[in-house]
């Protein structure tokens, strides 16, 4: 990918520092020239509070949700941020302690209560966090910040004010939903979450939220389950972070990283476990891929199997002459990558960060090709007949289809992650370019563009600079897929630099067009979107 940059100064630690929200927007200092057509807001989510009083959060996905906004107008940029007033945040601020258990941090009963009150408080049921630090997405004319539980939080994208909490369980049968829904051109929202199916077994439901209609009724009120995927283990659902969608098909990748529901319901309530304590790996299952017909709402019984990997982000999925092309950011093996994302590990000195990353699963960008039509007469043969891929699908005697991928990118401890594409033009359709955040031993230190057809790579990188997920914004008169810009929030703690800036790159070659510097640190952000006026 590039000559590997070292980080002995440990500037990446600034990504994990608590900051205060802003009372008014800051005017950014622009160098270069922001395209005049770039008008709107870059909205992003991430943790901004890494401790409450003397109580620290322990995992990358624990800090309290901070909502960020960069406004673009006539070549000028302003920056604003506010904490999302979730129940988790408001109660923590009120009681000056961690009140609701987060991903890797346990909340314990109020020490001021007597022993009987503290004991009985364990039996009120599992209290699920609403800490919406992962992503933002539109539903109708509204915007919601989300994590991966059943709670989403409606926010005002102009003022960043928190409007209300919404419990998806009140509308559809899911225990939670991913932070990576698919949004169709008409505004229809698709998402996936696990649920309890027939005979108290676990399954995965695809939920659909329709677009806003003329009656202006909240589309969430009309949410429905459109198809259900079975679970390989009746009591242990897999961790699901994203899924694939095309105009006609839904693809769900079931990995060996499992949630032990017995541990979740018992140990959590009685002994103070957290989400991370409830994960375990099934070392023998490998990966199961599932497909459903989106329009007919029907599950296919094709048994796609492959070797084990972790999966967080789908890049894109599309149909090609009777096959589904599924491009994924994989991590080899069955061990859970999140085991390596505790803040203590991420804040270590550079040599220790590298040592920890060497123990973790190896990242790789892969393309899997799934044949949709299976003929038993083809047992033992490669069913993939497409000329432009080396991926294979072998029909086995037990009627499983064993998949081997084509590797699109692989580098030692160098990940292409947090992928983005020209989603409006190419989501669920054939495409050429993907943009990603380059992780160097888990440290984000480069931005990348990948040609998925030729495997050519372009890159932006500077010393002591730590970018975020790249967001592609198409220019109004675009003719080609990569006509536009890429936006990324960069933390820059090096000598002689401003604390942070918004970077604007030419999407063609990742050359710098402009940057908008601000006089404040910006902690790590995970995902977001560009909202046009």
From Swiss-Prot:
Q: Where in the cell is it found?
A: Cytoplasm; Cell membrane; Microsome membrane
Q: Where is the lipid attached (S-palmitoyl cysteine)?
A: 112, 231, 329-330
Enzyme Commission numbers on file = 3.1.1.64, 5.3.3.22
Q: What cofactor does this chain's UniProt record say it requires?
A: Fe(2+)
Task: Give the modified residues of type Phosphoserine.
Answer: 117
Q: Which GO terms describe its biological process?
A: camera-type eye development; circadian rhythm; detection of light stimulus involved in visual perception; neural retina development; response to light stimulus; retina homeostasis; retinal metabolic process; retinoid metabolic process
Would you identify the family this protein belongs to, as annotated?
A: Belongs to the carotenoid oxygenase family.
Q: How does it assemble?
A: Interacts with MYO7A; this mediates light-dependent intracellular transport of RPE65.
What protein is this chain from?
Retinoid isomerohydrolase
Taxonomic source organism: Rattus norvegicus
């Amino acid at each position: 990918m590039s000559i590997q940059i070292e980080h002995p100064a440990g500037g990446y630690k600034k990504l994990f520092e608590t900051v205060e929200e802003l009372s008014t927007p800051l005017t950014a200092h622009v160098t270069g020239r922001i395209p005049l057509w770039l008008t709107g807001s870059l909205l992003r989510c991430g943790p901004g509070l890494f401790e409450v009083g003397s109580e620290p959060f322990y995992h990358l996905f624990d800090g309290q949700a901070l909502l960020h906004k960069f406004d673009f107008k006539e070549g000028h940029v302003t920056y604003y941020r506010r904490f999302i007033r979730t129940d988790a945040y408001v109660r923590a601020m009120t009681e000056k302690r961690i009140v609701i258990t987060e991903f890797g941090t346990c909340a314990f009963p109020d020490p001021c209560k007597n022993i009987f009150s503290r004991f009985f408080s364990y039996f009120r049921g599992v209290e699920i966090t609403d800490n919406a630090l992962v992503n933002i997405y539109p539903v109708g004319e509204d915007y919601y910040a989300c994590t991966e539980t059943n709670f989403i939080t409606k926010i005002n994208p102009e003022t960043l004010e928190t409007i209300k909490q919404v419990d998806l369980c009140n509308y559809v049968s899911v225990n939670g939903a991913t932070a990576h829904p698919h949004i169709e051109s008409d505004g229809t929202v698709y998402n996936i979450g696990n649920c309890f199916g027939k005979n108290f077994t676990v399954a995965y439901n695809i939920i659909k939220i329709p677009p806003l209609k003329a009656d202006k009724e909240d589309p969430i009120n009309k949410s429905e389950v459109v198809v259900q995927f079975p679970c390989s283990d009746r009591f242990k659902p897999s961790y699901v972070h994203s899924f694939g969608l095309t105009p006609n098909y839904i693809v769900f990748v079931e990995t060996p990283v499992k949630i032990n529901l017995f541990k979740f319901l018992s140990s959590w309530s009685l002994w103070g476990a957290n989400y991370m304590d409830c994960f375990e790996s099934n070392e023998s299952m490998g990966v199961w891929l599932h497909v459903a017909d989106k329009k007919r709402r029907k599950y296919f019984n094709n048994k796609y199997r492959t070797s084990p990997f972790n999966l967080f982000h789908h890049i894109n999925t599309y149909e090609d002459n009777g096959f589904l092309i599924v491009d994924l950011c994989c991590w080899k093996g069955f061990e859970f990558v999140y085991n390596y994302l505790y803040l203590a590990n991420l804040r270590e000195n550079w040599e220790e960060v590298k040592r920890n990353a060497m123990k973790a699963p190896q990242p790789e960008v892969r393309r899997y090709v799934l044949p949709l039509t299976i003929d038993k007469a083809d047992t033992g043969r490669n069913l993939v007949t497409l000329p432009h891929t080396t991926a294979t699908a072998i029909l086995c005697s037990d009627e499983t289809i064993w998949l081997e991928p084509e590797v699109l990118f692989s580098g030692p401890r160098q990940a292409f992650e947090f992928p983005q594409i020209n989603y409006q033009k190419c989501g669920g359709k054939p495409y050429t370019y993907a943009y990603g955040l380059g992780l160097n031993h888990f440290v984000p230190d480069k931005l990348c563009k990948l040609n998925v057809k030729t495997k050519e790579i372009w890159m932006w990188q500077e010393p002591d600079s730590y970018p975020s997920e790249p967001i592609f914004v198409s220019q109004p008169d675009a003719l080609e897929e990569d006509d536009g810009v890429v936006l990324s929030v960069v933390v820059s703690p090096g000598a002689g630099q401003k604390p942070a800036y918004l970077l604007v790159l030419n999407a063609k070659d990742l050359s710098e067009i402009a940057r908008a510097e601000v006089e404040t640190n910006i902690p790590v952000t995970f995902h977001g979107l560009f909202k046009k006026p």
